[in-house]
A protein has these predicted regions:
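Mobile genetic element proteins and their domesticated derivatives, centered on retroelements
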Residues: 2, 12, 40, 56, ...
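A short acidic/small-residue loop/turn micro-motif
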Residues: 144-145, 156-160
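Mobile-element integrase/transposase regions
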Residues: 66-141, 166-170, 174-175, 180-181, ...
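C-terminal domain-tail junction helix/linker
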Residues: 203-207, 229-322
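RNase H-like two-metal-ion nuclease catalytic core shared by retroviral integrases
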Residues: 29, 94-95, 187-189, 195-199, ...
């Protein structure tokens, strides 16, 4: 056969060996891809909440596994695993026609993280259609702008202002020791936040009120972002909820997951609770797997410098009054 083909016997066997080696390499690569994709699937569906490539990578890190994000994206495409696409918060349409004149100034001016935890608190409302009959429920939350923790939330069947007041009361009940002197609550210009009862509640508790400029969602961007991601991750369960009580359980479970295990790149790949602990202790829990983020270290240093300056200004003001 080699004579007919005009090739040497050694050349023929060398060719066959290289082809077998190539096939063997491809088989090994395919097997490795399958093993890696099994890990990706485990991370993707952890606690039942779908994740994108970044969320998967961060979950893998917390499982003690390093995997390049490019590989994760490649394998997701190869095996047709798609992450959810975020949707806009529809609450704006509810309150557009219900404005008042009790607007607060925009004290925040997008300085979300300058003074550490417990200083800037973001609040907003969104709604869900749940169950086959598409019943409507409303969710009010208060989020720490620095740690991204959800500090208080209330789910309601009614859009009456009471459930927004209840959200603030939950915050004061559960986190009174964590709220800093001169803290502010920042919201949009919705009717719930311009009502006299809400304004008086904040004044009674010495919490400053700040509001976004009209029609400018970027002034409350971290809160908007939370609702967008949350809806992507829980909507499949919300649609199947057969009662308001079942929806409450879905929201409760998600809030626990979000604060404890919903990792975020801007939080140095940590969950909100872990990020708060990292800020307090200076100990980075993933240091054996990834390097600490230099931007985060600088941010912590800036916050501490800002707090020191505030204390000095406070002392100077007190001394001038003596």
């Amino acid at each position: 056969m080699c004579q007919i083909a005009g090739v040497s016997r050694s050349g023929f066997y060398s060719y066959m060996k290289s082809r077998n080696d190539k096939d063997s390499h491809l088989n090994r690569k395919e097997e490795q891809d399958k093993r890696d994709f099994d890990l990706i699937l485990e991370a993707y569906s952890y606690k039942g909440y779908d994740k994108g490539s970044r969320g998967i990578r961060m979950r893998l890190l917390h499982m003690g596994i390093r995997m390049n994000r490019k590989k994760i994206i490649r394998l997701m495409r190869k095996y047709h695993l798609f992450c959810p696409i975020r949707k806009a918060n529809p609450y704006r349409r509810i309150t557009r026609a219900l404005k008042s004149s009790n607007y607060a100034d925009n004290l925040l001016e997008r300085h979300f993280e300058d003074y550490g935890p417990g200083y800037v608190l973001l609040t907003d409302i969104t709604y869900f259609f749940y169950g086959k009959e598409r019943n409507k429920a409303y969710l009010s939350t208060i989020k720490d702008a620095f740690t991204k923790q959800i500090l208080a939330y209330v789910l309601s069947e009614s859009l009456e202002e009471d459930f927004v007041l209840e959200t603030v009361n939950h915050l004061l009940r559960d986190h009174s020791g964590d709220i800093r002197t001169n803290a502010m609550i920042h919201s949009d210009q919705g009717c719930h936040y311009t009502c006299i009862r809400f304004i008086d509640l904040l004044k009674d508790r010495n919490i400053r009120q700040s509001m976004s400029r009209r029609g400018n969602c970027w002034d409350n961007a971290p809160q908007e972002s939370f609702y967008g991601h949350a809806k992507d991750e829980i909507m499949k369960y919300v649609k199947e909820a057969s009662s308001f009580e079942e929806l409450e359980k879905i929201i409760d479970d998600y809030m626990d997951y979000y604060n404890s295990e919903r990792y975020q790149y801007e939080l140095s790949k940590l969950s909100p609770n872990e990020y708060l602990e990292y800020y307090k202790t200076g100990i980075y829990p993933l240091k054996d797997l990834v390097d600490e983020n230099e931007k985060t270290i600088k941010k912590f240093d800036t916050v501490k410098a800002n707090l020191k300056r505030l204390e000095e200004e406070k002392d100077q003001a007190a001394a001038s009054m003596e």
